[in-house]
Amino acid sequence: MKRRLIYSNGLHGLPTEIIACTEVQEKRYERTGEVAFALASLSWSDGIVEELGAIVLDSWKKCGVNAAKLPSGMLLSQNERVTSRVTNSRTESESNGNGNATGNTSSNANSNGNANGIYIRK
């Protein structure tokens, strides 16, 4: 079967990335409500690649997609931006022997915006 690139918007626990798939796999994504677009026939400008962000760009590279210019009359844009946040927190406490406790709390938060809901408009 012919393989082509589609954009997966991450619904139903699927990763947000551009993936190589068969037409049968693409139909499965459509049946489960996954929004997918055929992108194999399109090429990309450097500016568009930057707007989509490093995560999508890495996915393109893994799939062998090179940056180039968009075809005349085509516009690639984002209709949504999502943020995933991971927070790790740890609290340590010690008793000083007099019934008093000293505490130390450390936390680390990381926020990462991912391009989502990409669509093609003529």
From Swiss-Prot:
Ranges of Polar residues composition bias in the record: 79-90
Alphabetically ordered keywords of this record: Plasmid
Record organism: Leptolyngbya boryana (Plectonema boryanum)
Record field: compositional bias (Low complexity): 94-122
Region feature Disordered, mapped onto this chain: 79-122
Protein name from the UniProt record: Uncharacterized 13.1 kDa protein
